[in-house]
Amino acid sequence: MTAASPWSVKGIDPKAREVAKDLARRSGMTLGEWLNRMIIEGDGQTADPRLAGDDVPNRAYLEIVKDDAPPRIEIAEHPADEVGRVALALDRLTQRIEAAEGRNAAAITGIDHSVRDALTRLGASEREQIAVAARFEGAVDELKTEQARATERLRRIESEAAGPRSAEALRALEGALGKVAGHLYEGEARTREAIATLEAKLNQQSSGDPSALVEAVVARLGERLEAAETRTSDALRELGASFQALDQRLGAVETANPATGVQEGLDSLAATLTQKMEAARLEMAAKLRESADGRFDRMERKLGEMAAHVQAAEQRSAQAIERMGREIVGVADAFNRRVHAAESRNASAIEQVGGEVARIAASVEHKLNRADSVQAQALEKLGGEIARITEKLAERIGSAERRNALAIDDVGEQVARVTERLNQRHERSSQELVDRIRQSEERTLRMLEEAREKIDSRLSEAQRKLEAAPPSPPPAQAPAPVATAQRPVPPAASPFEDNYFSQAASFSTSEDEADAFDAPPAPARSFEVAEFPAAEPEEPAFAHDDYAIADGFEPESPRYEVEPEVSDFAPAEPSRPMSTRDIIEQARAAARAAAASEGKGGKAKSAKKEKASKASGSLFSGFGGFSTKKSKARLGATVTTALVVFAAAGALGAGVGGLLLLNTDDGNNSPSRVAQAIAGRKADVEVNGPEADTTPGAPRAAVALTTGKVVPAEVEAPAAPPTNEAKALFEDAVRKIESGDRSGVELLKRAANGGYPAAQFYLSKMYEGGKNGVKVDMAEARRWSERAANGGDPRAMHNLALYYFKGEGGPRNSTTAASWFRKAADMGLVDSQFNLAQLYESGLGVSQNPAEAYKWYVIAGRAGDSTARGRATALRSQLTAEAQQTADRSALAFRPQTQVQTASLSSAAPAAANANLGVAQRVLSQLGYYQGPRDGVSSPALRMAIAAYQRDQGLPPTGSVDAETLNRLSVYAR
């Protein structure tokens, strides 16, 4: 490709074409060589990926061994992508083109200013020429005016008689002619100065180098020059017309010859005067001859003198008129010569300006045509190179899009995997919380049962004491009740400080109590007069305030310990654990019974017992009438303790249930074990009546107390766990196979069909190696490895990943291989961790991520792999400090999953991988909805594609393969 060869590419800016050619010319090479150096040869050629992959040694540990150490593979190195270098070269080329465009814009701006200055000067010259023409016309008008005045004065001279006035008129005429001559001289001087100035400007413009100025002129200069030429031509035509009119006027003035008219007028005037004077003389002579004879001579002499005077006057007038004629002729001749000289100079100057303008226009046009041709050639070449580069970029962008699609699928699988792990954690935490709630309820029930038994024992003991006591004698002494009434009332015992069962024997050993039963009762009037602060009746037991703790409004929870107080009694375990509702109902029944017994038995009791019951106002004040101040406080503390423990357990259960419901992925879907636990204990947790939550806003714990139906997640039922029979079959089959008994193969198949992952993996290895009478069948080996991997065996996951990566026993799929390597790596398999790191490092099956590769190398190195440690050290230099810190933290926080977690994960895997998903993947790929692997495994991309298809078909966009969606997809499958 030469610098001048034409090339044709549409859509290229001429400026960019010219700039590219100019840069190539400055570099001393052709445009193609320059573009090759800038775009392709800038950072050096990269090696062929396939050759690079063949030259690099790999670690493929693919031999099958019997021990538990699975093989590992080495991934070939991948070449780096060249899109970055091409983009960098294009950026540099764009920057250079923009700089050249800036320089061109600056040059064009300067040329524009120069052209504007030239046009301004041309306009000034035109205005000066118009001013000169106007001055010429003014001078001609003044000349015409003066000529009219001279003609008028000559007419007056002719009409008037000869005398002093004629001389004055001639002098005035001479003065006017002098003024006219002065005006003409001044006009000539101004014209000369204007012409000299115009010549100087033209010389100044022509003295510069016009070729240097013309080279920088662009298309707009031609248009403006054409406009200037048009205006100049119009001005020249107007100036020519003005000069032509001036010439006509000067010709008229010249042909008029005012001196000839004056001479003829004077001659006719003289002849007329002569005739008149002759006639007058003859008449006067006749009259004189008639009238006088002596005086005739004197009159004749007088007339002779008069004739002489008249003749002298005529001679002077003739001489003056002749002089005036000569002056006028000279003035006209001089004016004519000067006007002709000015016209010739103006014509030559205008002709010179027109020639210069034409030459400049021709040069500019030539330069512009040459620049257009050069720019067209440069842009054609640049367009060809850009088209080639565009094709390469399109190919690389397509490959990048394909890699991005694979990366998106990988991300979707990772998201699904993370979601699966989160669900497992939620299930574990929910199960733990359910167990804790159950244990808490059991402890609460035991405490309540112990408290109830102790209360019953105390009540029965008090009842026995009341029955054994003698009947009270009639009142004999009045001072005794007064002394009893004036006894100071002890303060009520606080349930948070005293041990509520520390005075268990106070009913029989209390001295105050014995005095109370032995003392005779006082008259009723004494009790009516005595004033006690606590004598007013209180509200019935278990009123609305007593349930404030259950409502969650008690600001301070009990601080006393329960277990140490009840540990000494060791009550028997209840035959059946009571629910929270049963406890509440029994407490209500006890309160109602206490109130009823207090109302009925109060009349039959003594006044002292009645007064004591009124003063106490406690829950158990009506049982036997034996309660003192201290025993009342003990019993109240027991009931309060039971209620507080019950309320705390209920609130804890409600809060945990609400939290579990709110932490699920879907508002209507709960984990299966949580849903079962809630359904099994819904009767125990539900609270009605006063125990319902009365706080505004309905806290989150209320969610667990609602009676709404819990809808489980729409997933298929997980596979049943392997039974002990399958495990026993597997152990028996292994013993027989290792001893050489081929009947163990059938037992192994039965165990594998029973869903035992270890048996499935063992059978897969037998099909792979062809041992013990089993033929080599890689397809069967792959199938059984997949079943074992779905069952949660990490070795099977690693083996299945190798099958997918190498394409043994089925199609090759690096993305699926990376997924199974990831699952095995999560379970702590070192070789899978190493292989997964290699996949992330090379970008096979997953998006290339050096930080993730470094993390898995570090994890494998911590597990004892020295090669992984070396790889991690080599890869550390390629990471930023922040990425390295993040990867190190992730590696330190890594904990391998247990077999229980794997089993839980594998139970959800068969639900996602089924034939229906495979059909959906194939059909949606044909219809253009889905682009990804057709492995029958659910992914976010597949769910989005299914939702889009359902939306287009007018179905609910659930994202799952329901019956209607499967029927419509099956039409395309058939």
UniProtKB/Swiss-Prot annotation:
Organism: Caulobacter vibrioides (strain NA1000 / CB15N)
Record-given protein name: Localization factor PodJL
Segments annotated as Sel1-like repeats: 757-793, 794-829, 830-865
GO cellular component: membrane
PTM statement from Swiss-Prot or TrEMBL: Two isoforms exist, the full-length translation product PodJL and a C-terminal truncated form PodJS. Both appear during a specific time period of the cell cycle to control different aspects of polar organelle development.
UniProt miscellaneous comment: PodJS must be degraded to preserve the asymmetry of the next cell cycle.
Coiled coil: 81-163, 218-320, 375-469
SUPFAM superfamilies assigned to the protein according to its UniProt record, in alphabetical order: HCP-like, PGBD-like
General function of this protein: PodJL provides the positional information for the localization of several polar organelles (pili, adhesive holdfast and chemotactic apparatus) by recruiting structural (CpaE) and regulatory (PleC) proteins to a specific cell pole.
Keyword Ribosomal protein in annotation: no
Transmembrane segments: 642-662
Compartments in which it is found: Membrane
Membrane topology: Single-pass membrane protein
